[in-house]
Structure formats: structure tokens, C-alpha cells
Amino acid sequence: MNKTIVIKKKIHDFKKTITVSSDKSLSIRWVLFSSIASGKSTAYNLLMSEDVLAAINAVRKLGIKVKITKKFCQVFGKGIEGFKYKKDITINAKNSGTLGRLILGLLINSKYKIKLIIY
């Protein structure tokens, strides 16, 4: 089932269902991308591994609301500059190199010190 979505104009409202397999790397990326999107993003079949939970905890530390139920996970993104925190923070990426690499790119312009722990 290969379908391509081509976007030719600015998106104001994107309501499309995309079905992918439950995968750790995709789940981490979904959490991070959803956190910088504007509005609510919902994922079904999200892999709830230790690394994905670390990504969820990381965006929560950055002021993003995340709702987890038995059926789905919702991230309430605040846009590309929506991370809100008023002090130096520590983000524990656990053992996730994917989370560590990707979140540094999102936080590169922070005016606060950010300590990233990966073990």
C-alpha cells in the first residue's frame, strides 16, 4: 500500500490518516514532529518502548501536553517555536541515540542550558 501525498500549497488543516507499522524510530520521530506541529496529532499503534516514553517525557519537559490512553497517544503541539521552559533543563534520552540526535536539532537555538543524558 504505497500512497504518496503531494502538498502544493500552504496547509491550514491537515486531516489525513496514515497507517504505518509500530516502530521505535518512527514513534520517536512522530512524538517530536507532533510537538512542533500546531494543534493535536493522534497516533494509534504507537510503540510504547522505553525510548519512545523518553521522547514523550522530553517534550513534556519542554511544555508540550501529551495524552496517553490504551488506544492512542495525542500530542498537542505548539508550533516550531512552541517549546516553553524558563530555566536550564535536563533531558534524559535514556538509551535512545535517535532521540538525542533529533531533539538537539530542535533545541539548538535555546537561550537556556540544556543537559542531554544518553546512556
Residue ranges, per PLM feature:
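Short, structured segments at the rim of ligand-binding sites
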Residues: 1-119
